[in-house]
Amino acid sequence: MGHWPESKPLKMQEFIVELQPRIKTFEMGGETFTLETGRIARQATGAVLVSTGDTAVLGTVVGAKEPKPGQGFFPLTVNYQEKTYAAGKIPGGFFKREGRPSEKETLTSRLIDRPIRPLFPNGYMNEVQVVLTVMSASKNHDPDIAAMIAASAALAISGIPFDGPIGAARVGYTNEKGYFLNPTFEELSTSLLDMVVAGTDEAVLMVESEAKGLTEDQMLGAVLFGHQEMQTAITAIKEFAAENGKPRWEWQPEAENTELLNAIKAEFGGAIEEAYAIRDKMARYERLGEIKSAAVEKLAGEEEGQPSEEEVKKYFGKVEKSVVRLQVIEGKPRIDGRDNKTVRPIKVEVGVLPSVHGSALFTRGETQAIVTATLGTTRDVQIIDALEGERKDPFLFHYNFPPYSVGEAGRMGSPGRREIGHGRLAKRGVAAVMPTIEEFPYAIRAVSEITESNGSSSMASVCGSSLALMDAGVPLKAPVAGIAMGLVKEGDKFAVLTDILGDEDHLGDMDFKVAGTKEGVTALQMDIKIQGITDEIMEIALEQANAARLHILDEMNKVIAEPRAELSDRAPSITTIKIHPDKIRDVIGKGGATIRGICDETGASIDLDDDGNVKIYADNAAAAQAAVNRVKEITAEIEVGAIYKGRVERIVDFGAFVNILPGKDGLVHISQISERRIENVTDELSEGQEVLVKVLDVDNRGRVKLSMKEVKEGEQPTDFAD
């Protein structure tokens, strides 16, 4: 029988993991920021932990060295995620773990994507994924600025071709303090401005903001202030990358096929220019499709040296872009024949849907939105479980962009990132003029259905929502309108375009959206695709946008200039009354019997708080008033001299006990039943009989003396509805 060979004792080798963090700190807006790499996520292409106060965000980037075969676009993805453990919480729900991205996570992912995307070189097709994970969260500051800095720093040290870094800053404003950096949540609640600015050391690339009617000069000042203050972050990231960054990858853009470019210009440039003179979008697209097909048929081939179909289409697009941009720079009419400052024709209708609480159809050229406003009770408010704590939002805004709006068949389903982002921008535009929940105790939902789109559907949603809300009777502080601006810049020449088309957005260098009232700006969003946008250009764009906004408001005001005085008959009726806190138990009753009885009797719903505030919800005003009357009856104090309609509860030899309020009886003495002498109470009264009585007295023990004979003919009982 064989034996296993004798095993030799293994030598235990001690492995030591060396974690050597490299750290840099800088100050911005009175806060200390720390950049750290080399300790966490070392297998990522680049990883930086950014800390400030109690906030810590891990930024990682992974990039592919080579593009996927046939890749025709830049596959950049940005994922911002908030872990509930960062705030010392356990996720709610059955599964007790984070699930699909929240709206806040989606919006912040877009916020980070927008300024970094234009800084990758043209033609770069390698996959890049940026992941920002909030690992510790302060209850005072939003972690989005730390996340933007983390993304910038991770890209800066990764070696991936990236023309950054960027910095980011949040700017607040009050009349007393002026502009200030890094506002807390508490400071934002009283600030007239909430603006996030991002950019490089030379240029602003992205602005996202909401304001409470600031002027164009104040908004521009905030942009410049934020850009100036973020320079400390940009300098720190540059120094951090110089000390800790990997060598920049060797990457060269694909050599331009000038022969093909010139061939398309020569053969089809004139036809493309003629096609862009067609005013109708669908007809223009059809003609451009025909020209493109002809170019592919003539120039593409499978033989050696011939360009592929995809290559011909790519260079055809470049010729399209150059044709349109040259026309704009030379001052020629735009694609639809307008000059640079003219707004497309506007058509406004309200009350277009009979069953909804408020509705509007807003059409501007080939962009159209049907917007509805629905009123609900405070039970319908959105409950947001954020890292900084739970809060309630009574104003909901949802934006839908179905594929038919651009003449296409496509995916239908839950909203994508773009729809969520556009909805939030439109909501920012009208939020400043919305009433508070105390002023108007309703939950409000606005829904924008984009039915046609050719540029700036989000700003059409702003206009449409303002109209629909006023149609519903929501007491807006002022009407709001929005406009999208564009820019074409070639060298030192530039043209600012008012009310851009979809093609102008795609082919231009800037997307600049402004919403506001006649008095000032309520929202500003800016995305810039190139370097070199000067203060002068931004100032001109804001001035031009102001003129366009006032024009649109004038057109809207011709149809409806102020909220309707009455709510829709279909809207729920909400009434708020105040009772003494000691009376709450009377309204609730034993085991809730009284309040349930009121609800069953009237069809209303009732909410009470500890301060004695009673909110009554009903489908119509009559049901609400009936419930109000019942609550007032229950909580009313008996008034001497008042007349009540009561019910005889019990008859005794010396009189009758009459119930005049819920749970409150009084005695009508036999001598107070009639002017004439009565021998037997039962000769005049019977149990269950309804009678009018007047209160003569309430003694210090709460005993109530009533009289029937003191009620004069024609007198009516006290009206508790008043």
From Swiss-Prot:
It comes from the Bacteria. Keywords: Cytoplasm, Magnesium, Metal-binding, Nucleotidyltransferase, RNA-binding, Transferase. Its EC number is 2.7.7.8. The keyword rRNA processing does not apply. It is found in: Cytoplasm. Its main location: cytoplasm. PANTHER family: POLYRIBONUCLEOTIDE NUCLEOTIDYLTRANSFERASE, POLYRIBONUCLEOTIDE NUCLEOTIDYLTRANSFERASE 1, MITOCHONDRIAL. Involved in mRNA degradation. Catalyzes the phosphorolysis of single-stranded polyribonucleotides processively in the 3'- to 5'-direction. Component of the RNA degradosome, which is a multiprotein complex involved in RNA processing and mRNA degradation. This is Polyribonucleotide nucleotidyltransferase. It comes from Marinobacter nauticus (strain ATCC 700491 / DSM 11845 / VT8). The lineage of its organism: Bacteria, Pseudomonadati, Pseudomonadota, Gammaproteobacteria, Pseudomonadales. The gene is pnp.
